[in-house]
């Protein structure tokens, strides 16, 4: 349900001033138009992330080139679906995050069938919850015409974020039953229960957060699909996210970004875009109205990026958006 928790809401109040900030408007538009493209009950097996950068990708750009000089692939174009091996490019998705991937065997048909049956048990209720939560953002956007500046920024963020290759998926559209990721010394499975190496509650919480960090690399619809299958993980967030948890997750995502070889503008621009993407996807975990998590993202951006962005010419300047694109 989208009920609110008084104690959690008191932690980070969301007032009218927050709703009117450019940060919140970018987050709201990006979430609605670029992350969750399908309804919760219907998922396309096709990857929503583009599989690669363009032939001239970010890894080949000089430090002085602007975002507009990079030929970002359109996420829905046929050319952007072509797989390009970027394993040795330092600016690829895996290079930015320092992820070591190991693969295991595919799940058996019986196991997949059982997982699907369990998923359907609560899919309808989650779908209703998502529709109600999404309506909060839609209401915010419908009160007034969306600023073309906001649309241009959100679209550019999508171009930047979705240019990095996603975790490998099977040809049939399903995911391998066991994909082991190792990051910052933590190892875990992407499906099923989170293995706990120690009885310590703190260790368990750290592994859960690390798992979420990895799941955030999937497209929005794929992320929600995996969350539906992982009741154990979702059970840890029955009361929704707190800002402290949101901040920890976002901090860990950004810690995995390797900006070496990139200009400060590109590095900060990519990190800010990543925060927007992470915030949008975390709305799938929280049980409260979506604008609460977007409020978390607004606070995080204002505290960590907005001052620097304003000092360097604003969002359009940082992301390389021309006046023609805004108009």
Swiss-Prot record:
It is found in: Cytoplasm. One of its GO terms (biological process) is regulation of apoptotic process. Transmembrane segments: none annotated. The modification Phosphoserine is found at residue 44. Keywords: Apoptosis, Cytoplasm, Membrane, Phosphoprotein. Isoform 1 is widely expressed. Isoform 2 is testis-specific. One of its GO terms (molecular function) is protein kinase binding. GO terms for cellular component: cytosol; endomembrane system; intracellular membrane-bounded organelle; intracellular organelle; membrane. A motif (BH3) lies at residues 212-226. InterPro entries: Bcl-2-like_sf, Bcl2-like. Phosphorylated by MELK, leading to inhibit its pro-apoptotic function. Its main location: cytoplasm. A motif (BH2) lies at residues 308-315. Plays a role in apoptosis. Belongs to the Bcl-2 family. This is Apoptosis facilitator Bcl-2-like protein 14. It comes from Homo sapiens.
